[in-house]
């Protein structure tokens, strides 16, 4: 059986994570990477040992030898890039969110199914051993009827108004930030564990830092940066720092959870009860 040939589009924080994951599979070759320009693509390729690089992602899509692509770009680019990949006949694994609107997601779903291509998101938290154990226990009936669920997902990497990342900009990220970035993981997890779908919810979202200091240069995800006054611009923020949600699942189950990217001391604190 021949190995699948795959490529990465996007060289930010998740690029190295996906490169490592692909290499651990054993039956997939990571053959190319695309970034915003030739230099950054080449630098990333050299750092992780990928043989080919390009500053134009369409070069990868036009390569008939590549079976699948991982799209790891800012959220607003997911829709055009996934669509282009599907039209080029590539199977797609895309970072969440798939798109920033439901209409775009439905269009891509229909396109992928019409072309009989694999298209998916990866919710990596599903694969922790404890998560798989809880799911097996629920499926075996060991947990009884699940009537109440609750939990949190808290981080602190955007605690200060000097913390910056492209996700703060709704033009790149979409309207939902904390809720879309980490709340989506919590909602996927609770549905995965309980076997029930969320049927209704109401949410209170809050932006605590109405303005932030945007650096003149780029800042990689989860990295801090000390700025001098002449190195930043004060910009308005319209994405959420925090969210509290009440939800209904199935016929009887009820629950609540909170998400935050401004909880001091919480690096990646996830809980489900």
Task: Describe each PLM feature range.
Residues 5, 205-206, 226-273:
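NAD(P)-dinucleotide binding in Rossmann-like oxidoreductases
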Residues 28-32, 67-69, 176:
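Short active-site oxyanion
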Residues 43-50, 107, 111-112:
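Short, conserved SAM-binding/catalytic segment
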Residues 50-57:
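Conserved SAM-binding strand-loop segment of SAM-dependent methyltransferases
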Residues 68-75, 79-126, 141:
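Beta-strand-loop-alpha-helix segment that lines the small-molecule cofactor/substrate pocket
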Residues 125-234:
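Predominantly a Rossmann-like dinucleotide-binding segment in NAD(P)-dependent oxidoreductases
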């Amino acid at each position: 059986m021949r190995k699948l040939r795959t490529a990465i589009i996007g060289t930010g924080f998740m690029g190295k994570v996906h490169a490592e994951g692909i290499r651990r599979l054993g039956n997939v070759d990571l053959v190319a990477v695309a970034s915003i320009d030739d230099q950054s693509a080449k630098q990333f390729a050299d750092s992780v040992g990928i043989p080919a690089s390009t500053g134009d992602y369409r070069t990868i899509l036009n390569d008939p030898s590549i079976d699948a692509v991982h799209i790891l770009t800012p959220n607003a680019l997911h829709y055009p890039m996934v669509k282009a990949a599907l039209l080029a006949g590539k199977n797609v694994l895309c970072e969440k969110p798939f798109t920033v609107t439901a209409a775009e997601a439905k269009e891509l779903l229909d396109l992928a199914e019409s072309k009989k291509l694999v298209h998916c998101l990866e919710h990596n938290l599903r694969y922790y051993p404890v998560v798989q154990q809880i799911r097996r226990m629920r499926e075996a009936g060991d947990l009884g009827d699940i009537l109440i669920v609750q939990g949190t997902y808290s981080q602190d990497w955007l605690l200060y108004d000097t913390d910056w990342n492209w996700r703060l900009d709704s033009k790149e990220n979409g309207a939902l930030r904390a809720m879309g970035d980490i709340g989506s993981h919590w909602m996927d997890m609770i549905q995965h564990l309980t076997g029930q779908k969320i049927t209704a919810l109401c949410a209170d979202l809050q932006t605590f830092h109405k303005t932030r200091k945007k650096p003149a240069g780029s800042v990689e995800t989860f990295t801090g940066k000390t700025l001098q006054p002449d190195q930043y611009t004060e910009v308005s923020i319209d994405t959420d720092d925090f969210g509290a949600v009440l939800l209904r699942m199935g016929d009887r189950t009820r629950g609540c959870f909170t998400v935050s990217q401004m909880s001091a001391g919480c690096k990646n604190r996830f809980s489900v009860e």
